[in-house]
Structures are given as structure tokens and as C-alpha cells.
Design a protein with these regions (language model features):
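Short glycine-enriched, charge-decorated loop/helix-capping segments at active-site entrances
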Residues: 77-82
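An active-site-proximal "capping" alpha-helix that borders the catalytic cofactor pocket
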Residues: 41, 85-101
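Divalent metal-dependent phosphate-bond-processing catalytic cores, especially two-metal-ion Mg2+/Mn2+ enzymes
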Residues: 2-12, 27-54, 65, 75, ...
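Short, flexible active-site-proximal loops enriched in glycine and acidic residues
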Residues: 103-110
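Short glycine/proline-rich turn/loop motifs
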Residues: 20-26
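His-Asp-centered metal-binding catalytic motifs of divalent-metal-dependent phosphohydrolases/nucleases
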Residues: 56-76, 87, 91, 113-122
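Generic alpha-helical secondary structure signal
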Residues: 16, 20, 63, 111, ...
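Membrane-helix interface segments
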Residues: 55-56, 108
Length: 213
């Protein structure tokens, strides 16, 4: 199949390898709740990056592969090893080979790895592509989707043994994450998510009445 090209917001976008990559992630994103973040996140990057000049191939690849190291079958099963696990370092090691098998442009791999290295809120993105990905990933941790992603980890993630652990994480997110957004577009997108997030926490506190456990 010849490489299909289109132009969106001034960016040259290729599609030939994308279906292969998305299918690889769909099959590897386990447990099942690990899938869904990737297509939602990519859709968010298009909104966050609207009007900016950037390489969408780089953002797409990083979006689908940045969390490779948190998938079952890729991360350690031993709880002590898992507590020390660096999922970013794992992804940086494995992603070049995966992209090569998908037929991705090898000249863009370094840019993809830069996005993956700096996609977390604590990181300092060094490119417009990594800034877009990081902002979009922060947005995915806020609002209704952010709440669902956190609560589904209770009893399945070593960080969330109880509902109180999840509530504390959600409270920390609404306090700390909005201020880490770099782009004005991201801040605008965050407003409704922040409202939903705060209303949920207030309702949770009222209904649990100190008995969330």
C-alpha cells in the first residue's frame, strides 16, 4: 500500500503504519482498563495542538506507546520489583524496535523517545510535541475520565489499596495538575474537567461522611 498523506493544521501526517501500531497496543494493553487511554489521548492531542506547527507522526507514536511499561506482560509481576519499576525507561528501550517493525520513519524515533521521557507531570518537555503530549496526558487525569481511571485501580494497583487512597490521589490531582499545564489551549480544556472533578470530590465527602475507608 502506498503511503497516504494529508495535511492537518499545517502538519504532514502519514497513516500507513498507524493501524499496525494501534492494533499492537490494543492487543498488549492489559489488563483491559489499560486500553482506551491511548485513542482518547490522541484525540486530546489534536485539540491541545490545534493551530500549532508540529509533527503529528511523532505525537501519534508517543501517544500510543508511552505507557507500554505499565502493561501486564511488560511490567514485572513481583510486587517488590514492580514498586521499583521504571516504566518510562522500559518504553524508551523497547519502542524503537516496535516502531521499526511498524514501518515508522526511523529519523523521527528520537523525537518520539523525547516525548515518552517527558510525558509525566513532573517532567520538563523539550519540544512542542512533548509539550502537547504531556498536557493531554495531564488532562486525562482530570474530570470524569480521570476519576474512572483512578477508581478502577483500587485493589489492583499497589498504590490504591482502599477507596481512601483513590480519593487522596484525586484530591492531589486537582490541587497540583492544573498548574502544570503549559499551553493556554490545555488550560481552557481543563476548566470543565476541573469543575466535574471538584464536584465529585465534594459529593464523595458528603456521602461518605468520614466513612469511605
Amino acid at each position: 500500500m502506498s503511503c497516504e498523506l494529508t495535511v492537518k493544521a499545517g502538519n504532514l501526517i502519514s497513516f500507513e503504519w498507524r493501524e499496525t501500531l494501534s492494533e499492537y497496543v490494543r492487543l498488549n494493553a492489559l489488563p483491559v482498563e489499560k486500553y482506551g487511554h491511548q485513542p482518547r489521548l490522541y484525540a486530546l492531542t489534536l485539540k491541545v495542538g490545534a493551530g500549532l506547527a508540529y509533527d503529528d507522526d511523532v505525537v501519534y507514536a508517543a501517544t500510543w506507546l508511552h505507557d507500554l511499561g505499565v502493561f501486564a506482560g511488560h511490567r514485572p509481576e513481583d510486587l517488590q520489583q514492580l514498586a521499583r519499576w521504571d516504566h518510562v525507561a522500559y518504553a524508551v528501550e523497547k519502542v524503537p524496535g516496535i516502531l521499526d517493525e511498524c514501518g515508522f520513519d526511523g529519523t523521527k524515533v528520537a523525537a518520539v523517545l523525547e516525548c515518552i521521557r517527558n510525558h509525566q507531570p513532573k517532567d520538563e518537555p523539550q519540544s512542542v510535541e512533548s509539550t502537547i503530549l504531556r498536557d493531554a496526558d495531564i488532562l486525562e487525569q482530570l474530570g470524569a475520565v480521570g476519576i474512572m481511571r483512578t477508581v478502577c485501580k483500587v485493589g489492583r494497583d499497589t498504590r490504591f489499596a482502599t477507596f481512601s487512597d483513590a480519593a487522596a490521589s484525586l484530591q492531589k490531582a486537582i490541587v497540583e495538575l492544573p498548574g502544570k499545564l503549559r499551553l493556554e489551549t490545555s488550560r481552557k480544556l481543563a476548566r470543565e474537567r476541573m469543575r466535574v472533578h471538584r464536584e465529585f470530590l465534594a459529593a464523595l465527602a458528603g456521602e461518605a461522611d468520614g466513612r469511605l475507608f
